[in-house]
Amino acid sequence: MNIQIYVNKKNPDVLKAERFFKERRIPYQMMDLKKHKLGKKELELFIRAAGSARALVDREGKKALERPVAHMTTDSLIIAELLNDPAALRSPIVRNGSKVTIGADEEVWKQWVAEAT
C-alpha cells in the first residue's frame, strides 16, 4: 500500500484518517495542499472519485466560502481554480495508488487493507 493523505487543515476527518492508518501500522505520507501543487492528472483522478469538480470544493467555514471557487458552477473554471489554489479542496483526500476517497471513508480503507494482506 502506498497511502497519501492530502490535507488543507486539521479537521476531525483528517484525524480519523491519520488514526486509522497509525493504528494499523500502515505507513502514509501527508501532503499539505497549501504547499503541494497538484498536477492536472492528479486532480482528474480526484474528480473521478468525487463525481464532479464541484464536489471536491471545500465549502465549510467562513474562510472557505470567501474563496471564489466556492461559488463557481462550471467544472472547467473550478478545475483551473483548484490547480492554482489546491487549499480549496475538501480534505482529507486519501489516495492508495489509483484509488481515492474524499473525506473519511473507513469502510473503503478497510477494503484496501484486506486487499493488501
Predicted regions located by residue number:
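Local sequence-structure signature of Cys/Sec-based thiol-disulfide redox active-site neighborhoods
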Residues: 1-24, 28-33
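Thiol/selenol-based redox catalytic cores and closely related redox-interacting motifs
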Residues: 35-117
